[in-house]
Curated annotation (Swiss-Prot):
Its EC number is 3.5.1.2. Homotetramer. This is Glutaminase. The lineage of its organism: Bacteria, Pseudomonadati, Pseudomonadota, Gammaproteobacteria, Alteromonadales. One of its GO terms (biological process) is glutamate biosynthetic process. It catalyses: L-glutamine + H2O = L-glutamate + NH4(+). Belongs to the glutaminase family. Keywords: Hydrolase. Coiled coil: none annotated. Pfam families: Glutaminase. Substrate binds at S63, N114, E158, N165, Y189, Y240, V258. GO terms for molecular function: glutaminase activity.
Length: 304
């Protein structure tokens, strides 16, 4: 377990970067977040959690939820059913690209871009009677926090600005790769993105990625092989179009969200969550990436 002093050092080390990024402003509910927040939490495979800075302040997890939705799909479907509808390759395009969906005849490159996550949400919608409730149940169980909830204001705000995601879904539907009612699936998808969690919640919830598929309670969520495969996808595609830069600087599987959160994993050791709302040009937390880079260097850890 890293010492508290190290986590505090990491937070202070990146504080001078505040003001250099830009808070997501495409929906009003995200634009109003205090840009000066910085938080970090780590959870070890022994189940201990430690944090520094604003690590107990909840934020909108946004695309980090795509890890949970894929994990849930892996518990409900044969893998062949999932991977026949979504790929495993980095995209090289923006996370909400229509061009790639058109060029590749409705099959998204990976489950962590919007098109891929919409296919996963479509799969969940068709298999579950109450997909929103099931997701909430899962993240509460994984984080050991039954107060985790959806931010309805964020979900509604995203729905009101959903034209592009609807276009992606309808385009995939035209190629036969979207089964459900687009509006219903979009509402589910936006609720997933609108989960509100803090760094401590997320570092606990993602522990299964560091612990061979076992959650913080020791329950097996997915198999050891599936966990390794999921971490591989996170290493290649988890950071939008900045995955290569992140691998170079941080050297861990990770997933970011435009709410400013990033989760990262040192397999066999610990799961980490950082939060700083200001984003870089790729939509990844600017100071968050720097916190993970500094922590990785100080711990001497990298998967490479």
């Amino acid at each position: 377990m890293p010492e508290l002093a190290l986590l505090e050092e990491v937070v202070e080390k990146v504080r001078p970067l505040l003001g250099q990024g830009k808070v997501a402003d495409y929906i009003p509910a995200l634009a109003s977040v205090d840009a000066g927040k910085l938080g970090i939490a780590v959870t070890t495979v022994d189940g201990e959690t430690l944090g520094a800075g604003d690590y107990l302040e909840p934020f909108s997890i946004q695309s980090i939820s795509k890890v949970f939705s894929l994990t849930l799909a892996l518990t409900l479907y044969e893998e062949a059913e999932i991977w026949s509808r979504v790929g495993k390759e980095p995209s090289g395009h923006s996370f909400n690209s229509l061009v790639q969906v058109e060029l590749e005849r409705g099959k998204p490159r990976n489950p962590f871009i919007n098109a891929g996550a919409l296919v996963i949400a479509d799969l969940l919608q068709s298999r579950l009677g109450a997909p929103k409730h099931r997701m909430l149940e899962l993240v509460r169980q994984l984080s050991q926090n039954d107060k985790v909830s959806f931010d309805k204001q964020v979900a509604d705000s995203e729905y009101q600005h959903s034209a592009r995601n609807a276009a992606i879904a309808y385009l995939m539907k035209s190629f036969g790769n979207f089964q459900g009612d687009v509006d219903t699936v979009l509402r589910t998808y936006f609720h997933y993105c609108a989960l509100k969690m803090n760094c401590a919640d997320l570092s606990k919830a993602m522990l299964y990625l560091a612990n061979r598929g076992k959650s913080i309670t020791g329950t097996e969520l997915i198999s050891q092989v599936q966990t390794r495969q999921l971490n591989a996808l996170l290493a290649t595609s988890g950071l939008y179009d900045g995955a290569g830069e992140f691998a170079y600087r941080v050297g861990m599987p990770g997933k970011s969200g435009v709410g400013g959160g990033i989760i990262a994993v040192i397999p066999g050791e610990l799961s980490i969550c950082v939060w700083s709302p200001e984003l870089d040009g790729n939509g990844n937390s600017l100071a968050g990436t720097a916190m993970l880079e500094h922590l990785s260097q100080r711990l001497g850890r990298s998967i490479f």
